[in-house]
Amino acid sequence: VGGLNYLVLGFVNGIACGFSIPISWTFGAKDYKEMRRYTANTVWLSIFFAVVLTIVTVALTRSVLVWTNTPENIIDLADIYIRTIFAGIPFTLLYNVTSALMRALGDSKRPLYFLLVASFLNIGLDLVCIIMFHMGAFGAAFATVVSQAVAGLGSLLYILRHYPELRWSREEGCFSLTHCAKLCSMGIPMGLQCSITAIGSVVLQGAVNGLGSDIVAAQTAGGKAAQFLCVPLESIGTAMTTYASQNMGAKDLDRVDRGVYTALGIGCVYSIASFLILRVTDKLLIGLFLDASETAIMANAQSFIFWNLSLIHISEPTRPISIS
């Protein structure tokens, strides 16, 4: 379910990041009235996308799992897990939008703090739900959704208390087709960019699922390890979204150029370093997701992560340029 999960949640993360671009732009230009209008319309669009995505994904999950040849011995567990995750899309979008708003105004620390709290809470709830209450796949998904809800609601309360400049008047809070069109022109392409590769992963999953549950387990573990190593590169791109938007709004194009080249350099250095480290520690990294005694699955996971990251680390350093 990794590809399907990333397809939807990657889109959610992307649209939230895209919605923040006009807000960053107007903040950099010190046009606070327009910034509040974009913020208000971001809220209306987020509610719309949360409702539509939740209904569509929950309704279609089982059909997609069948279409991708999910093995019969795990399809029910996969269905329960992914449906529960998708039922929590409103909370996922809430955290992504509120954290994007804080980053748009130059605060990248608080989103991290709320995410750390959610991560530790998720670990604790996993132990409680799976080990103590034996809730299985549903328990793991439920723990994730609750953690996202805590992070999202915490971020929202923080914004309401500490960012009075985002509080819009009745006039500024009215739905505006012009502002929504601008937000969608940024958010939807960003959402597709963050999820488009997952479409290929979903199609590939259909072929992988036909090879049996051992190969599925290997591909899932390898995919988690690969995603773990790619997160810093994606974060550089997300940071460049805010950085470039604020400086474009302030009309400081030289600073944008310097930021892009700096981000590209950081991405290249990280890609080379992480790939070299991976060659030494791949078994240890995959061991975080697999039992070391499952040698056949471990070998297949090592093969997957090697070829996966060999290709990704060639293209991924250019992500900051394409996003910014």
Region spans (language model):
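Small-residue-rich hydrophobic transmembrane alpha-helices
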Residues: 1-55, 92-111, 218-282, 315, ...
